[in-house]
């Protein structure tokens, strides 16, 4: 199985151009002296976060990126042109790691954010630099320096306002397809969702981004099943929608399994605000519905919302509950930004 949220890429900056060995040749000047120009610098390697990309799939097909070398120096003290840069365009939320996949190089969280990964090699000196009192006509010049090279890992963590979590087949993809324009792959077997799907939810003239995170199983934080890679996707969401399927025999145990995985993974996931819903509720009769909602309320220590993506029951209530948390987080963020700007103005004055 291949995933689109991680890719290993080779990058190389351009070599510097060589300096020129050249002598001034003009009429009536017999010994013109050296006039070899310097070589141009090699191209750099940049990475930039751009709009319109949601996955790293492009880096499955092209994994080697090399900037152009600098142009060699020329006579008449002309410096060679700098080599063309290479810019890796990635989705917002991409993190760049060194080859060990642990050392973070940069984290791109905004559209237009750029980071210089590798600098091109310096150009070599032309022979004009080697003229001295004892050597008026030097026939040597420096070669350009080689460009840097590196293997890097690109890792994408989705930046979504809310994340859908739950065991496989809890009805997450069906819910996402119901409330957004996203078209996730849906089938009745575990791990249908092999990479996260994003959708935009509109409710009461407001909107937020919802991510369908692939199904967790017991031991996911240690890489079991699809692995802990996907727990990383929910790190940046402001609120979690925890779906428990009404088809589960023991809904309380199912709820606790996912909570254990969130706690074991760490990174504050278990402290995030959570909305709990019993999905696929249309499969239950009235008595089963009451029993399972009560058991879930006891396990979660909060009321669980009934939900059916098939009939539409409870969908609006769940979305409004999520929107309230998302809106509160946005207002808190805006207030913090305003306070920061005010403090900055006072510091500058």
Swiss-Prot record:
This protein's source sits in the domain of life called Bacteria
The alphabetical list of record keywords is: Cytoplasm, GTP-binding, Hydrolase, Magnesium, Metal-binding, Nucleotide-binding
- Do the record's keywords include Metal-binding? yes
The cellular component terms of Gene Ontology attached to this UniProt record, alphabetical and capped at eight, are: cytoplasm
Q: Which residues bind Mg(2+)?
A: 173, 193
Q: Where is the Obg domain?
A: 1-159
Q: Quick one: which residues bind GTP?
A: 166-173, 191-195, 212-215, 279-282, 308-310
EC number(s) in its UniProt entry? 3.6.5.-
User: What is the enzyme's main class?
Assistant: hydrolase
Location of the OBG-type G domain: 160-327
Gene Ontology MF annotations: GTP binding; GTPase activity; magnesium ion binding
Q: Name one GO biological process term.
A: ribosome biogenesis
Q: What cofactors does the UniProt entry give for this protein?
A: Mg(2+)
Q: Which PROSITE patterns is this protein grouped with?
A: G_OBG, GTP1_OBG, OBG
Keyword Magnesium listed: yes
Q: Which family does it belong to?
A: Belongs to the TRAFAC class OBG-HflX-like GTPase superfamily. OBG GTPase family.
Q: What functional role does this protein have?
A: An essential GTPase which binds GTP, GDP and possibly (p)ppGpp with moderate affinity, with high nucleotide exchange rates and a fairly low GTP hydrolysis rate. Plays a role in control of the cell cycle, stress response, ribosome biogenesis and in those bacteria that undergo differentiation, in morphogenesis control.
- Kindly state the subunit structure of this protein: Monomer.
* NCBIfam families according to UniProt: Obg_CgtA, PRK12297.1, PRK12299.1
Q: Which HAMAP family match?
A: GTPase_Obg (MF_01454)
Output this protein's name.
GTPase Obg
Species lineage, top-down? Bacteria, Pseudomonadati, Pseudomonadota, Alphaproteobacteria, Hyphomicrobiales
């Amino acid at each position: 199985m291949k995933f689109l949220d991680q890719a290993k890429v080779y990058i190389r900056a351009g070599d510097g151009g060589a300096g020129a060995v050249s002598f001034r040749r003009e009429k009536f000047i017999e010994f013109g002296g050296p006039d070899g120009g310097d070589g141009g610098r090699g191209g750099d390697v940049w990475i930039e976060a751009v709009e319109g990309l949601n996955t790293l799939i492009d880096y499955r097909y092209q994994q080697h990126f090399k900037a152009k070398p600098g142009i060699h120096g020329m006579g008449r003290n002309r410096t060679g042109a700098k080599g063309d840069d290479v810019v890796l365009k990635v989705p917002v939320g991409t993190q760049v790691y060194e080859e060990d996949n642990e050392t973070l190089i940069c984290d791109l969280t905004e559209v237009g954010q750029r980071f210089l990964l590798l600098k091109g090699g310096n150009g070599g000196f032309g022979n004009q630099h080697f003229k001295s009192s004892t050597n008026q006509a030097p026939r040597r010049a420096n070669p350009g320096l080689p460009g840097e090279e590196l293997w890097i890992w690109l890792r994408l963590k989705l930046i979504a306002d809310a994340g859908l979590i739950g065991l496989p087949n809890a009805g997450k993809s069906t819910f996402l397809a119901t409330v957004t324009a996203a078209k996730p792959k849906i089938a009745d077997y575990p791990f249908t969702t092999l990479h996260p799907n994003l959708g935009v939810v509109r409710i009461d003239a407001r909107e937020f981004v919802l991510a369908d995170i692939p199904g967790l199983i017991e031991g996911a934080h240690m890489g079991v099943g699809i692995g802990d890679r996907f727990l990383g996707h929910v790190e940046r969401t402001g609120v979690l929608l925890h779906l428990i399927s009404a088809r589960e025999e023991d809904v309380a145990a199912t709820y606790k399994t996912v909570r254990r995985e969130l706690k074991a993974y760490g990174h504050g996931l278990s402290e995030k605000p959570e909305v709990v819903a019993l999905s696929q509720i249309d499969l239950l009769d009235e008595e089963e519905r009451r029993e399972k909602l009560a058991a879930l309320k006891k396990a979660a220590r909060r009321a669980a919302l009934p939900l059916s993506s098939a009939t539409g029951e409870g969908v609006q209530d769940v979305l409004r509950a999520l929107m309230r948390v998302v809106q509160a987080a946005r207002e808190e963020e805006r207030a913090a930004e305003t306070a920061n700007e005010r403090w900055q103005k006072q510091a500058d004055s």
